[in-house]
UniProtKB/Swiss-Prot annotation:
Chief location category: cytoplasm
Gene (UniProt): rsmA
Catalytic activity: adenosine(1518)/adenosine(1519) in 16S rRNA + 4 S-adenosyl-L-methionine = N(6)-dimethyladenosine(1518)/N(6)-dimethyladenosine(1519) in 16S rRNA + 4 S-adenosyl-L-homocysteine + 4 H(+)
GO molecular function, one term: RNA binding
Stated family: Belongs to the class I-like SAM-binding methyltransferase superfamily. rRNA adenine N(6)-methyltransferase family. RsmA subfamily.
Coiled-coil portions: none
Function: Specifically dimethylates two adjacent adenosines (A1518 and A1519) in the loop of a conserved hairpin near the 3'-end of 16S rRNA in the 30S particle. May play a critical role in biogenesis of 30S subunits.
UniProt EC number: 2.1.1.182
UniProt KW keywords: Cytoplasm, Methyltransferase, RNA-binding, rRNA processing, S-adenosyl-L-methionine, Transferase
PANTHER family: DIMETHYLADENOSINE TRANSFERASE, DIMETHYLADENOSINE TRANSFERASE-RELATED
Protein name in UniProt: Ribosomal RNA small subunit methyltransferase A
Length: 256
């Protein structure tokens, strides 16, 4: 199919057979899996997935691609295509033990990752191709430059595995940046205390609002220096020096 990639959807189509096989190996789809693909595009992953699965749900926003995907011989009786923007979908409607995969458009990857956390109780695992810089941010340890809001929120909810890099030449058209594959597995037994997720997201967003300022400055009016000291948290540190567990402590304190 001749399809002109649409900039507004951030479309770059995966072409490289070796990379496709490596992604499939990482996902390891089993026939009865409850699997959902976000942004199937021209079906580079969709077609080999359908060959292994009894059924696949896919969410695609592009009307031209919707028609193309439903007409694929391998789709017949197996592909449940949802014509929608993934940022508007209730993922829990597809049942429990959902396995989510996708080559996520660069322009919506961060908001989509945060959005998916709302449905984490329905999800078994997620495998995504993302801009390499985004995967580095997700996997970053505290005290590093890449560590930020995305690192805290995703590591609170999931075990993060940075799997491998994907070069620009694996795509058509070639993106200007490298990509990478990440596996996100929701914690079945969390290493962190349970906390109100909205409170955590709010405190993390405020803490990272100005990265060069100290935690005390960024959280002024929310928590005092003496209260931070009582929690054993150094208010003189910058936000990227505060661990996920410490952000959980802060969110818990504010919730109370």
């Amino acid at each position: 199919m001749r399809h002109s990639p649409r900039k507004r959807f951030g479309q770059n189509f995966l072409q490289d057979k070796y990379i496709i096989n490596e992604i499939l190996r990482a996902i390891n789809p089993l026939a009865d899996d409850n699997m959902l693909e976000i942004g199937p595009g021209l079906g580079a992953l969709t077609q080999p997935l359908l060959q292994k699965l009894n059924r696949l749900t896919a969410i695609e926003i592009d009307t031209d691609l919707q028609s193309y995907l439903t007409c694929l011989p391998v789709s017949q009786g197996k592909l449940n295509l949802i014509p929608a923007d993934a940022l508007t979908v209730d993922f829990c409607q597809f049942g429990p033990h959902l396995r989510v995969v996708g080559n996520l458009p660069y322009n919506i990857s961060t908001p989509l990752l945060i959005y998916l956390l709302k449905f984490i109780t329905c999800i078994d695992d997620m495998h995504f191709m993302l801009q390499k810089e985004v995967v580095e941010r997700i996997a970053a340890a505290h005290g590093t430059k890449a560590y930020g809001r995305l690192s805290v929120m995703l590591q609170y909810h999931c075990e993060v595995e940075y799997l491998f890099d994907v070069p620009p030449e694996a795509f058509e058209p070639r993106p200007k940046v490298d990509s990478a594959i990440v596996r996100l597995t929701p914690h079945r037994v969390s290493p962190f205390e349970s906390v109100n997720t909205e409170k955590l997201e709010n405190i993390v967003a405020k803490a990272f609002a100005m990265r060069r300022k100290t935690l005390t400055n960024n959280l002024k009016g929310i928590i005092s220096l003496s209260q931070l000291n009582d929690l054993g948290i150094d208010g003189g540190k910058r936000p990227e020096q505060i661990s996920v567990a410490e952000y959980v402590q802060l969110a818990k304190f504010i919730s109370n």
